[in-house]
């Protein structure tokens, strides 16, 4: 295909298609596709003004230039323009004009062809009429070149066509779009390698082998007749790599499918083969290409020094065994010591050559060792076409017994000599999953203690055990504690008791002989108070009401004799009362929580009432005290304002009798005033309430408080009757009678 001249490009510019939408660089007019209305208008204007007035025609068309109007008319709308297929007469005319004007004057050629442009004539010549253009079917070699070039160049068909002499860019493009592209996308296209490149690769491989001092011996073709028949399921190296000589004979001798099949077998054969399992060869190019750095040095693969298989299948072994047959080959073996001596010696001396070892167990040189190991993974290569390198039996014997291992950048002894803490612990205290051994003394439930004795000393019987750390687990008592134990004896733990505070108070009383008032200081922190019972809350509110709010308290007046008789025991009795009260107030089962008053009488008739703040004197206790004093003397009549009672049995002996006594008084709406003729009298006096010291006798209760406290009100009496009725029904059959006590 000839090159196009500058004149052809200028000629094509005159007939350029303007249907594209690319804007013009000089003007702002946009190239838009021509519409049918514009085509009709252009035809009318050309018919009116002629083909020379393109400026006037363009002025009548919106957004159209003179060049656009001319190109549209000459290429599309001209009535004499022929767009159909080329006739035989036209082809002959083009061939004749090309011989006359050449391939660079397409404008002159187009003028002599009615209805054809220069571009049409040029394309017709280069694509069809040129005798250099190949019209035969595409070959596999051309397909391979097109595929490889398209991967690099893309859709630059002119440059791809230069690689294929006789093929035009248009033909290459059409062939790619119609055939090759579909095969590549579906994966059915196999890249076929050129035979010339394969031969060149084989020659370069053989030259590299010679540079590395590798000795390759070729066997004559006649020896192939002695090769035993191989199994059908084993791939033979002779089928994988056919020599060029054999391939040329088959191509020249055979015709049709025979030559094509032979070529396909040779061209599609892969370059690298790996030995897998025992007798199978598989392609290993994927493995090597994935990690080329690790596979670059094949000399790092070891198959074992004692393996005789590698010696039998190696090229060195073939050289030794075939030496008598190949008489024209002379081998020389240079030793490393000989080379070192040559460097030290003078020039012109003879080179000592060591004889070839005749024994089959001779050690080949290091260069041949590397070549032997490399030959295991690569297919054998031959120099001339009429020889086969190895037989099937030798190929089978080349199979290694173990898988090749890459060279490691570290030493395995690093892992063998390294022991972690977990490994040492597992060795010293193994899990009991089998029959226990005598040397193992640890139990499963016993906590693990690290034994610092080496493992060698544990298993040895004649080595004295290391008792250096034997005493670490024994607890040592400090010297001051030892002296204290010798002097006072061992400590005895006290039994836990819920009344530890009361026990300490009793110890203090017994040892000191005095009674102390222990007042607990309130803590600054907010303490959680236990919920009080309803009875305790009622009693506390009534007591505070009597002390703080009642405007008319009554005072208790006692004769001097009685007061003098009671003074000596006031302090001691009050201390005991305070101690008992402080202890009882903290107990859940105290006297106040039981709902009745505990009376503790003494020699001086001191009465204590359970309360949390004040000590109040009950009228019932005073009456009881008066009755006890009357027992020592004669019976004195007990006078009231309403009458005189001389019988001592009328004195209330309990709260129940006092309740009955006050009930009769309340019924008559008169509060009695108790008078005594002998010892003392009790009178309600209207005086101001005085704050007495805690050591003085507290003030007596008022009449209103006593009425409510002893259940003298109407609602309380009603509740008492109902309660007694219920109790009588409930405990009707019980032998013991219980009294209801209301406080």
From Swiss-Prot:
Record carries keyword Protease: no
Pfam families: Cmyb_C, Myb_DNA-bind_6, Myb_DNA-binding
Name of this protein: Myb-related protein B
Tree of life domain: Eukaryota
Record-linked PROSITE patterns: HTH_MYB
Domain HTH myb-type as annotated: residue spans: 26-77, 78-133, 134-184
One of the GO biological process terms: mitotic cell cycle
Subunit structure: Component of the DREAM complex.
Gene from which the chain derives: mybl2
Chain spans, region Disordered: 1-29, 221-262, 381-406
Biased composition (Acidic residues): 9-22
Keywords: DNA-binding, Nucleus, Repeat, Transcription, Transcription regulation
DNA-binding region of this protein: 54-77, 106-129, 157-180
GO MF entries: DNA-binding transcription factor activity, RNA polymerase II-specific; RNA polymerase II cis-regulatory region sequence-specific DNA binding
Principal location: nucleus
Record has Repeat as a keyword: yes
Cellular component GO terms, alphabetical: nucleus
Cellular localization per UniProt: Nucleus
